Amino acid sequence: MKLPIYLDYAATTPVDPRVAEKMFQYMTMDGIFGNPASRSHRYGWQAEEAVDVARNQVADLINADHREIVFTSGATESNNLAIKGVAHFYKKKGKHIITSKTEHKAVLDTCRQLEREGFEVTYLEPESNGIIPMARLEAAMRDDTILVSIMHVNNEIGVIHDIDAIGELCRSKGIIFHMDAAQSAGKLPIDVQATKVDLISISGHKMYGPKGIGALYVRRKPRIRLEAQMHGGGHERGMRSGTLPTHQIVGLGEASAIAKAEMATDNVRIAKLRDKLWNGIKHIEETYVNGDMNQRTSGSLNVSFNYVEGESLMMALKDLAVSSGSACTSASLEPSYVLRALGLNDEMAHSSIRFSIGRFTTEEEIDHAIEVITQSIDKLREMSPLWEMFKDGIDLNQVQWAHH
């Protein structure tokens, strides 16, 4: 067993060895290294063919047409292109956008930028289980609403939104629906023929593909128009200029094909490990799961250990690679904005740890994790005066702390 044990699959996944092996064939002089846009010789044609195959593999993952897939540098760029692209193209129709308070920063900060440009954004509050109620979404819709951007799966707590219902509602009102699927593509079935979603952001490195590559699904029927954010040679049907990185695209394609083939078996195994982990630690006093327990992805478990500081717990869990909050905001000392939006107080939000399990997690690793977590919590609580006061029956919310 390799230490530390990697339990941070929601931050990134290792590249599947089968994907890495395939990528190696598209980089060196011995391989297919040409520019896919070079139309005058075999090096370019072979690269273009490899890109076409990968485009089909990504499209197959979500049951789309290959012409609806635009390659980007990742989900952050896809979110930017989708949200800014729609806002700028349809601004004469309206300037109102709806999103939620628990979105990834790549969506929230893009919306903030649009606010600076004169757009109006409504940030919906979730229920305490992390899910946005449909009635709240419908109530926020106006005649000038042009876009709804709601994530499929939350990156911190793993809850799943009902995208079919959101899609139906948006389509009935003539509003474009964008979905950030960084955490769900390759892990949950997505079918764009059945779900009325217009734009989907996909990330390679969240599904055992390489970092630095992603895709944006752009619906053709009804046709969604975007204003390009990256200008140049007019690649990707004018939506995203820049030489296509063949080896990364091949990696994303291969990762998509593997995910499609193995999703069902992967999910059963991962859910078993997740339940094993929770069953192994839920007996610890004052331990709570954040987010809906049923409507969540198989690999995700966000737990608050009351009266334990999240940062000190992470230090104590040095054998486990876990995070408090998302990797993108883990450098800040602020409590998770996602958990605060669920109604958790600062203390509970600060004492949360995100465990995310994936394709290469083993049972032995989970057993070790349970042991380490149990010991660490005991040790930290032994040192905590707050825990002692709580055990003595003192209501800490009523305590008047002296200010020095």
Swiss-Prot record:
Per the record, the GO terms for biological process are: [2Fe-2S] cluster assembly
Identify the keywords attached in UniProt to this record, alphabetized. 2Fe-2S, Cytoplasm, Iron, Iron-sulfur, Metal-binding, Pyridoxal phosphate, Transferase
Q: Cross-referenced Gene3D superfamilies, in alphabetical order? A: Aspartate Aminotransferase, domain 1, Type I PLP-dependent aspartate aminotransferase-like (Major domain)
Binding-site positions, [2Fe-2S] cluster? 328
Which pathway or pathways does this protein act in?
Answer: Cofactor biosynthesis; iron-sulfur cluster biosynthesis
Q: Which GO terms describe its molecular function?
A: 2 iron, 2 sulfur cluster binding; cysteine desulfurase activity; metal ion binding; pyridoxal phosphate binding
Cite the InterPro entries for this sequence.
Aminotrans_V_dom, Aminotrans_V_PyrdxlP_BS, Cys_deSase_IscS, Cysteine_dSase, PyrdxlP-dep_Trfase, PyrdxlP-dep_Trfase_major, PyrdxlP-dep_Trfase_small
Q: What is this protein called?
A: Cysteine desulfurase IscS
Essential cofactor(s): pyridoxal 5'-phosphate
Residues involved in pyridoxal 5'-phosphate binding:
75-76, 155, 183, 203-205, 243
What is catalysed by this protein? (sulfur carrier)-H + L-cysteine = (sulfur carrier)-SH + L-alanine
Does this UniProt record's set of keywords contain Metal-binding? yes
Keyword Iron-sulfur in record: yes
Annotated positions of the N6-(pyridoxal phosphate)lysine modification? 206
Quaternary structure and partners: Homodimer. Forms a heterotetramer with IscU, interacts with other sulfur acceptors.
Record localization: Cytoplasm
**What is this protein for, i.e. what is its function?**
Master enzyme that delivers sulfur to a number of partners involved in Fe-S cluster assembly, tRNA modification or cofactor biosynthesis. Catalyzes the removal of elemental sulfur atoms from cysteine to produce alanine. Functions as a sulfur delivery protein for Fe-S cluster synthesis onto IscU, an Fe-S scaffold assembly protein, as well as other S acceptor proteins.
**GO cellular component terms, semicolon-separated:** L-cysteine desulfurase complex
Cite the source lineage: Bacteria, Pseudomonadati, Pseudomonadota, Gammaproteobacteria, Alteromonadales
| Annotated active site | 328 (cysteine persulfide intermediate)
